[in-house]
Amino acid sequence: MNAIAARITGMQHIGLPTAEVQKTIDFYQGLGFTIATRHDINGRDFAFMKLGNLLIEVIPNDKPTMRAGAVDHICLNVTKIEELYKKIKDAGYKMIDQNIVDIAFWEKGARYFFIEGPNKERIEFCEIVK
C-alpha cells in the first residue's frame, strides 16, 4: 500500500447538486434515507442524507446541469430485489428499467434496476446473487 492509499479509508459521500433541496430530501427520505445533518451556510441550505454507510450531500445550486455527468449513477446494495422492485414501482418512482435486469457480474451474477431521481440522477438498486 502506498503512502496516499494508507490515508484513505473509503468513500465519504457523493455530492448531488439541486435547485430543489427539499424535494431532493423528500425523495431520498422516501427511499429510507435520514437527514444526518443539515446546515445553513451563507443562506444556502445543505443537507447530508444517510442510509447505512452511504452518505449523499444535497448541495443547493441555482443552475444544476440536470443531465448525466462524470458520475453515472449511485448504486444501493439490496436484498430481496423482487419485493423491493414492486414496492418502489408501486410507490410511483420514475422507473428507468421496466424489469429487473440480470447480469453476469460477480461469481453468480447480479440483478439490478434503475430509477430516476428529482435531479435526473440515476439510482441503481443491485443484489449480488449468492
Tell what function each PLM region has:
Residues 48-50, 77, 114-116:
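Short, well-ordered beta-strand micro-motif
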Residues 45-47, 72, 109-113:
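Short beta-strand micro-motifs in enzyme catalytic cores
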Residues 1-5, 89-130:
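Vicinal oxygen chelate
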Residues 16-55, 106:
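Core segments of cupin and vicinal oxygen chelate
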Residues 20-21, 78-82:
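Helix N-cap motif at beta-to-alpha junctions
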Residues 1-22, 71-74, 126-130:
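N-terminal beta-strand motif that seeds the catalytic metal site of vicinal oxygen chelate
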